[in-house]
């Protein structure tokens, strides 16, 4: 990334012997990566040095290191041989809160803890019932009990409140929401450690945590659709109107909060939606919307 910032060159090295095969401008490579991400959703990108700086303290003390992630890159757990000479295979145990309904549960002290209990129960069930062929995964799950509580619907919540994505107000709400979640997750981990015992990785160093890792932002594309069409993960909505192709057929998907705004102007018509669709889901051409509404959608 420093080479991208300075418009420097980047060496393409052989994965076999590390020799430089070619040198290209770093920004050109970065642009190609971002273009591929937009068009195909891949490749996923992680910053491994940052990941290892942020691993739990007891994993640092144990000399554990993250070498890779899962495909979607939200799970970054230690793999390979640990200090006891045993193999670890990372395990994903995930759930996602719907920020679109944040106002319904934000002040409920028990809600997040209940979700963390659910994840802890799922982890225990996996450890107890997984076949011996999953021995490395069972061992890793037993030692660290890492889970990942994530979210979906962040952009939907902003649109619900008429807050443009990337605005100062959205940044304020972003920090407020995730501070609230993190505080409740941390408390749940300590409460469960008191009740059920700390995970072995943490207990070895006198640290009272039920979970080594607690949060992870997964893409949530499918479950966001199931949850009423909330926006996926923490991503901005790509288009206000688009065709969703499935095995059951093709369906026109329309932004539910834009629909309410159009109804306010008596413009919730097929003609207007068709116009939005032909403009790649954009509303910038709709002259009856205010500047704030255009920024929001």
How would you label these PLM feature ranges?
Residues 1-297:
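Long, C-terminal-biased catalytic regions of enzyme "large/alpha" subunits
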């Amino acid at each position: 990334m420093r080479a991208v910032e300075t418009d420097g060159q980047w060496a393409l090295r052989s994965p076999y012997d590390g020799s430089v095969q070619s040198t290209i401008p770093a920004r050109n490579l970065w642009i190609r990566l971002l273009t591929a991400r937009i068009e195909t959703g891949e490749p996923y990108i992680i910053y491994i040095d940052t990941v290892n700086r942020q691993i739990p303290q007891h994993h640092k003390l144990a000399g554990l290191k993250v070498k890779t992630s899962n495909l979607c890159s939200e799970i970054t757990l230690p793999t390979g041989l640990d200090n006891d000479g045993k193999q670890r295979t990372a395990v994903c145990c995930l759930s996602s809160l719907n920020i679109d309904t944040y106002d319904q549960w934000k002040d409920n002290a028990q809600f997040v803890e209940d979700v963390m209990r659910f994840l802890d129960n799922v982890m225990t069930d996996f450890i107890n019932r997984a076949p011996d062929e999953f021995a490395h995964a069972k061992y890793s799950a037993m030692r660290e009990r890492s889970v990942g509580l994530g979210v979906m619907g962040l952009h939907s919540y902003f649109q619900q409140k008429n807050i443009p994505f990337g605005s100062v107000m959205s940044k304020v709400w972003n920090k407020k929401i995730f501070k609230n979640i993190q505080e409740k997750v941390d408390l749940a981990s300590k409460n469960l450690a008191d009740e059920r015992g700390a995970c072995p990785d943490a207990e070895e160093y006198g640290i009272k945590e039920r979970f080594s890792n607690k949060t992870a932002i997964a893409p949530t594309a499918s479950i966001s659709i199931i949850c009423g069409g909330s926006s996926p993960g923490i991503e901005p909505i790509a288009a206000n109107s688009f065709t969703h192709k499935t095995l059951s057929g093709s369906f026109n998907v329309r932004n539910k909060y834009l629909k309410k705004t159009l109804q306010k102007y008596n413009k919730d018509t097929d003609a207007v939606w068709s116009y939005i669709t032909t403009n790649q889901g954009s509303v910038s051409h709709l002259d009856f919307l205010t500047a704030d509404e255009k920024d929001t959608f």
